[in-house]
């Protein structure tokens, strides 16, 4: 979330950032100028109301003291007049307090919907076609046969079952079994071992269900509510129904009551371990000596994929449930750029050990995530698809998430607390890594060779063959 003081003092800064995210068009500039004017207007109303409130509170306190003085001087007329004034002030103050809260809420809601400002070095652009390649590792392998896509390989092995998964859960789920399930587990364990043993990350086993505040802190809410899974108990659902009864469906009052009830009763399934890992420092003040704090977790992740209709409908590329190893760093503003490059190198390292061909691209202003200041995507080569596909996204968020979480640190030189900088990245997506291994290491006879780096995790199995 942005600092309203920064917007008030440097409105052009936010306008420029929003125009860059909008592709630099005149329409984007006009919309940005209107939004910033609206924000400044809300802030002026809020501050004016607070000034009025503080004035009335101060006058109430002063008048209350004057009442005592008037009574001590036997000036009953003055005391009576002051008591009437205090009574009027007491009647006005709750109204002003409520109004101040309303302005504060309106401003916070408006600020919460604004994306982070791109760093100056982020390339301009509208979408993924404008992303800039940064580096490349390895070369695409040659095959004496036409390589198959991962789902063709997995189904032919009899170890990847989408049909049964659909019976259990619907579309965009998979059942992996046998050696293929072990290979998937091996990938997650391998990634964790490298990041904890070689890269200095601390492993965390976090909750998979989180509250509204956690999702807000990392900026999944309110912007991406439609892409999340929300869960509740039967009693909770009935309570929500009772809370919203009598309100016109989809009215503002209904939505407000629904949001309030959901916040109290339910939980969100995490779309990424970034949510619980980053929120470990919410509402806290760390010492500078504790930073950088580097955390990793291997968790299931859950996404509704609301905007993915018609895309990647076959296979494991885009699923409602998938496993991912996440990397999170909490650091100081001075070190965040360096930490971003380090995180990228850590994510690349596991792919290099698997000898997978990949490239790194810097996302343009129009393709980067809502909370990001700058993002690198790692795209792995899939021989069966004949295309590079994202397997990791590493982002630096500055203090954008820290402000939403109120996560701070105390500088070593003894100055007042400052907001931390947060970074997150996939280290990497386990399901997509499995896809890459199946397509890269497939053999003409349909078997799959286990990469050397994974052999210690496979119990002596060197080749995955069709189940008999």
From Swiss-Prot:
Annotated localization: Cytoplasm
For this protein, the record's InterPro entries field holds:
aa-tRNA-synt_IIb, aa-tRNA-synth_II, aa-tRNA-synth_II/BPL/LPL, Ser-tRNA-ligase_type_1, Ser-tRNA-synth_1_N, SerRS_1_N_sf, SerRS_core, tRNA-bd_arm
Q: Name one GO molecular function term.
A: ATP binding
Alphabetized, the UniProt keywords read: Aminoacyl-tRNA synthetase, ATP-binding, Cytoplasm, Ligase, Nucleotide-binding, Protein biosynthesis
* Any one cellular-component term (Gene Ontology): cytoplasm
Catalytic reaction list: tRNA(Ser) + L-serine + ATP = L-seryl-tRNA(Ser) + AMP + diphosphate + H(+); tRNA(Sec) + L-serine + ATP = L-seryl-tRNA(Sec) + AMP + diphosphate + H(+)
Superkingdom of origin organism: Bacteria
Give residues annotated as binding ATP: 303-305, 390-393
Q: In which pathway does it act?
A: Aminoacyl-tRNA biosynthesis; selenocysteinyl-tRNA(Sec) biosynthesis; L-seryl-tRNA(Sec) from L-serine and tRNA(Sec): step 1/1
Question: EC?
Answer: 6.1.1.11
Q: Which GO terms fall under biological process for this protein?
A: selenocysteine biosynthetic process; seryl-tRNA aminoacylation
Binding-site residues, L-serine: 272-274, 326, 426
Q: Which family does it belong to?
A: Belongs to the class-II aminoacyl-tRNA synthetase family. Type-1 seryl-tRNA synthetase subfamily.
Q: What does this protein do?
A: Catalyzes the attachment of serine to tRNA(Ser). Is also able to aminoacylate tRNA(Sec) with serine, to form the misacylated tRNA L-seryl-tRNA(Sec), which will be further converted into selenocysteinyl-tRNA(Sec).
Q: How does it assemble?
A: Homodimer. The tRNA molecule binds across the dimer.
- List the protein's name: Serine--tRNA ligase
Name the species this protein comes from: Xanthobacter autotrophicus (strain ATCC BAA-1158 / Py2)
Its lineage reads: Bacteria, Pseudomonadati, Pseudomonadota, Alphaproteobacteria, Hyphomicrobiales
User: What gene does this protein come from?
Assistant: serS
């Amino acid at each position: 979330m942005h600092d309203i003081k920064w917007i008030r003092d440097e409105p052009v800064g936010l306008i420029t950032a929003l125009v860059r995210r909008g592709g630099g068009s005149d329409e984007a500039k006009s919309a940005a100028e209107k939004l910033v004017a609206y924000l400044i207007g809300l802030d002026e109303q809020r501050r004016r109301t607070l000034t009025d409130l503080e004035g009335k509170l101060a006058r109430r306190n002063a008048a209350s003291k004057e009442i005592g003085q008037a009574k001590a001087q036997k000036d009953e007329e003055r005391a009576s007049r002051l008591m009437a004034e205090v009574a009027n002030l007491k009647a006005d103050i709750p109204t002003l307090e409520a109004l101040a809260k309303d302005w504060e809420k309106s401003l916070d809601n408006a600020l919460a919907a604004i994306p982070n400002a791109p760093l100056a070095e982020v390339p301009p652009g509208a979408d993924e076609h404008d992303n800039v390649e940064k580096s490349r590792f390895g070369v695409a392998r040659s095959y004496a046969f036409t390589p198959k896509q991962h789902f063709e390989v997995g189904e032919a092995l009899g170890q990847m079952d989408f049909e049964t998964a659909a019976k259990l859960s619907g579309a965009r789920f998979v059942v992996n079994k046998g050696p293929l399930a072990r290979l998937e587990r091996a990938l997650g364990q391998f990634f964790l071992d490298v990041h904890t043993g070689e890269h200095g990350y601390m492993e965390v086993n976090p909750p998979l269900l989180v509250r509204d505040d956690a999702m807000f802190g990392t900026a999944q809410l309110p912007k991406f509510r439609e892409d999340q899974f929300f869960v509740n108990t039967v009693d909770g659902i009935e309570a929500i129904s009772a809370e919203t009864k009598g309100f016109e469906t989809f009215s503002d009052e209904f939505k407000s009551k629904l949001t309030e009830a959901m916040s109290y009763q339910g939980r969100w399934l995490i779309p990424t371990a970034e949510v619980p890992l980053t929120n470990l420092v919410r509402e806290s003040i760390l010492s500078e000596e504790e930073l950088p704090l580097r955390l990793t977790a291997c968790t299931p992740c859950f996404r509704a994929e609301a905007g993915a209709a018609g895309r990647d409908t076959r296979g494991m590329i885009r699923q409602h449930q998938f496993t991912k190893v996440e990397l999170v760093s909490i650091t100081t503003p001075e070190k965040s750029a360096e930490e971003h490059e380090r995180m990228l190198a850590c994510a690349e390292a596991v792919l290099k050990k698997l000898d997978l061909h990949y490239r790194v691209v810097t996302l343009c202003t129009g393709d980067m995530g809502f909370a990001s200041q700058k993002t690198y995507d790692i795209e792995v080569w899939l021989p069966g698809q004949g295309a590079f596909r994202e397997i990791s996204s590493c982002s630096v968020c500055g203090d954008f998430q820290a402000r939403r979480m109120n996560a701070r640190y105390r500088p070593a030189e003894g100055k007042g607390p400052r907001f931390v900088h947060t970074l997150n990245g996939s280290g990497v997506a386990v399901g997509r890594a499995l896809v890459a291994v199946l397509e890269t290491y497939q053999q003409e006879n349909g078997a799959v060779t286990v990469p050397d780096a994974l052999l210690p995790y496979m119990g002596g199995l060197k080749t995955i063959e069709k189940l008999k």
